[in-house]
Curated annotation (Swiss-Prot):
This is Proliferating cell nuclear antigen. The lineage of its organism: Eukaryota, Viridiplantae, Streptophyta, Embryophyta, Tracheophyta. One of its GO terms (biological process) is regulation of DNA replication. Keywords: DNA replication, DNA-binding, Nucleus. Residues 61-80 bind DNA. It comes from Daucus carota.
Amino acid sequence: MLELRLVQGSLLKKVMDSIKDLVNDANFDCSATGFSLQAMDSSHVALVAVLLRSEGFEHYRCDRNISMGMNLGNMAKMLKCAGNDDIITIKADDGSDTVTFMFESPTQDKIADFEMKLMDIDSEHLGIPEAEYHAIVRMPSAEFARICKDLSSIGDTVVISVTKEGVKFSTRGDIGTANIVCRQNTTVDKPEEATVIEMNEPVSLTFALRYMNSFTKASPLSSTVTISLSSELPVVVEYKIAEMGYIRFYLAPKIEEEEDESKP
């Protein structure tokens, strides 16, 4: 038997909105410690990992580890029917091929339940090794989203370069080039508006902007974003989910082809 009651139902809606365009179908894994998801996007370029820890739920019952295969587009449609202030309960019986979402208004005068069929999804669980990163950048999530949006009107890739001076986002396209530099500033009154850079060594990597723009859909979950970079590893773009957990996006860097490679 599985029963999870989340008072802040809007959190689950925001999580779904941030991943539904990236991943079609995925397994939600429930254990005694939390509710999690790990899935590759359809083109196997990006990986998303979500964790909602059990202590963040008002009520959390998971008698045994259970994996529920769901179509994320369909799940998002159901969650759209919940009000932003609604309490969301997720229920599934052992051996059942359905999951029930229950939405209660805060005043308890309206209760809706939606049942959805589960799917059998083959998915290998990828071990994500803990790594030491060359550079870690923490910055306002709205700022990062704005930079990715602005640069994608010029080019389709972004070069993220971290030096002790700051972090630089650059692109080039048919109409020209663009460079945006964010310097470290920790003196702001509000910590969520700070840009903090931890650098062991300089790093410069190229990524597809369409994925970065997709990741920034998670901005409503957190006022800050953490970007972890290392030359031989995928970038990790992480948004903390209140006190409950996180959503992490992993994206392999693009290898820049040598321009003169094709010449005889």
